[in-house]
Amino acid sequence: MSEKIAVVPGSFDPVTFGHLDIIKRAADVFDIVYVAVLNNSAKNPLFSVEERMALMAEVTKALPNVRIESSSGLLIDYAKEKKAKAIVRGLRAVSDFEYEMQITSMNRFLDETIETFFIMTKNQYSFLSSSIVKEVAKYGSDVNELVPDCVVQALKEKYGFSQ
């Protein structure tokens, strides 16, 4: 029997508890989960791809079936390269669904053998985004309940609040 492989893509700039929840839930369902840290040329990231990968590796180290990699090409090509049969995306709101449906439709057009699975975020993460975390952290406010400890520290260092 072949392994069930999935890809969880995102910029993860930075990784939040919402992202981590989706990754953990995907890891419960699939044999191997590739977390694809995307290098999106349309975004101006706070953290480099290498920094985001290191933070992701730290926060997922207790998940033995999760692999952290980066990708800068088409997601569907990355999924095919990894022999994934699924792309897993987290949804917070209806607005997320509309955007994700466009991406899913294009991915299906490019390769109809790879399915997209949407996982609804837990209620406590429904408002959470990396952009909101960065905005709050930039002004020195507490983000301990939004991101893992290593991310809190990395944000403090980026914004000059470290001891």
From Swiss-Prot:
UniProt site positions, description: Transition state stabilizer: 19
Coiled-coil spans in chain: none
Keyword tags: ATP-binding, Coenzyme A biosynthesis, Cytoplasm, Magnesium, Nucleotide-binding, Nucleotidyltransferase, Transferase
Top-level EC class: transferase
Entry binding sites for substrate: 11, 43, 75, 89
Gene3D superfamilies (alphabetical): HUPs
List of residues binding ATP: 11-12, 19, 90-92, 100, 125-131
Matching CDD domains: PPAT
Enzyme Commission identifier(s): 2.7.7.3
Location within or outside the cell: Cytoplasm
Chain's role: Reversibly transfers an adenylyl group from ATP to 4'-phosphopantetheine, yielding dephospho-CoA (dPCoA) and pyrophosphate.
Family: Belongs to the bacterial CoaD family.
The name this protein goes by in its record: Phosphopantetheine adenylyltransferase
Source species of the chain: Lysinibacillus sphaericus (strain C3-41)
